[in-house]
UniProtKB/Swiss-Prot annotation:
Residues 38-51 are annotated as: G1 motif. Residues 199-208 are annotated as: G3 motif. A lipid is attached at residue 4 (S-palmitoyl cysteine). Pfam families: G-alpha. This is Guanine nucleotide-binding protein alpha-10 subunit. Belongs to the G-alpha family. Residues 268-275 are annotated as: G4 motif. Guanine nucleotide-binding proteins (G proteins) are involved as modulators or transducers in various transmembrane signaling systems. PANTHER family: GTP-BINDING PROTEIN ALPHA SUBUNIT, GUANINE NUCLEOTIDE-BINDING PROTEIN ALPHA-10 SUBUNIT.
């Protein structure tokens, strides 16, 4: 008959098992960390940066009913803001509008504010007045000069879609959502899972007053996606009427990528609003705002020039890992570019660090 002997662990063996478990725990933690990457979204105000963020959010799945309702209210709020801006321009520059129309449209703006308070419910009569307002010749004249008073590109989109927005069961589409304009203050974050890698996307407010907050995130970034509106080469900043927007974008890009920060981060540059740029170069000369420009006033020559402008002032180390694309952030096609570029950059980052 065999004797079953009990196996007794010595104190030394117990300590070793404890150490092994701790090592395994740390390895598992490290493995999880390896599958997380942080992407910073930087750029000046109104460049389309937050629209890129919304496209990334759309890539993660559908919005909840609550989120859709919140965005419906924001659309009504945007319509109110756009209407007030247009009406103010008409009054300031004494464009031709009857006193009766002025009074009716003032009441319309007040009713829009009430619609925002009452969960985005728009009376049919209010929608009809909005359509009439948009068709008014003085308002259209003001809209044609929108670049001078910083009216966003989304105004026309929402006014053109009043018949759909006014419906009781209206739910915003992804195209509606990417057209919503709410200035980013502070830092907005969204998680995106891409090829089993968790990306933390951080959208940092682009106005000058918000930029001091950027530095808190610089050490954490694995990649930086900088968005600049190429179509704004002839426009001034909303917060500084003396400064050209594209000059500001280029200087900001040079400052961020001067070699002091982001020692290992990849650089992604989106020259955004390429659709508006295509229209603008038909009647606005790049050379009038950038005397260095010597090429033909075409989309091709213009984009080549601005690519060089951004690239020439950054630290040499960044030039080796810089990816540049022309984009239209409001188009769903930009999701393909985002997916391809981000995936390439992150995979390269992980290979460089031996994580994959």
């Amino acid at each position: 008959m065999g004797v079953c002997q009990s196996f007794v662990l010595t104190d030394e063996m117990k300590d070793q098992i404890k150490v092994n478990k701790e090592i395994e725990k740390q390895l598992e933690k490290k493995k999880n960390m390896q599958l997380e990457q942080t992407v910073l979204l930087l750029g000046p105000g109104e460049s389309g940066k937050s629209t890129v963020m919304k496209q990334m959010r759309a890539m993660t799945g559908n919005y909840t009913k609550t989120e859709l309702h919140e965005r419906k209210v924001l659309i009504i709020q945007n319509l109110c803001q756009f209407s007030e801006m247009l009406l103010e321009y008409v009054r300031e520059y004494i464009l031709e509008m009857t006193e009766d129309d002025d009074k009716r449209y003032t009441v319309m703006c007040e009713e829009l504010k009430m619609a925002v308070i009452h969960d985005g419910i728009m009376r049919p009569e209010l929608a009809d007045t909005l359509k009439e307002f948009w068709g008014n010749s003085a308002i259209q004249d003001a809209y044609s000069k929108r670049d001078t008073f910083h009216l966003t590109d989304s105004a026309k989109y929402f006014f053109d879609n009043i018949d759909r927005i006014k419906l009781p069961g209206f739910e915003p589409t992804n195209q509606d959502i990417v057209h919503i304009r709410v200035p980013t203050t502070g830092v907005a974050q969204v998680e995106v899972i891409m090829n089993n890698i968790k990306l933390m996307i951080c959208d940092c407010g682009g106005q000058r007053s918000e930029r001091r907050k950027w530095y808190h995130f610089f050490d954490e970034a694995d990649a930086v996606l900088f968005v600049a509106a190429i179509s704004e080469f002839d426009q001034k900043l909303a917060e500084d009427e003396e400064t050209n927007r594209m000059h500001e974008s280029i200087r900001l890009f040079w400052t961020v990528f001067n070699g002091k920060f982001f020692k290992k981060a990849a650089v992604i540059l989106f020259l955004n609003k390429i659709d508006l740029f295509e229209e603008k170069v038909k009647h606005v000369k790049i050379k009038d705002y950038f005397p260095k420009f010597e090429g033909a006033n075409t989309v091709s020559e213009g984009t080549k020039f601005f690519r060089r402008q951004f690239r020439e002032g950054i630290h040499p180390d960044f030039k080796k890992r810089m990816y540049t694309h022309e984009t239209c952030a409001i188009s769903d096609q930009v999701q393909i570019i985002i997916n391809t570029v981000i995936d390439t950059v992150i995979q390269d980052n992980l290979k460089d660090t031996g994580m994959i």
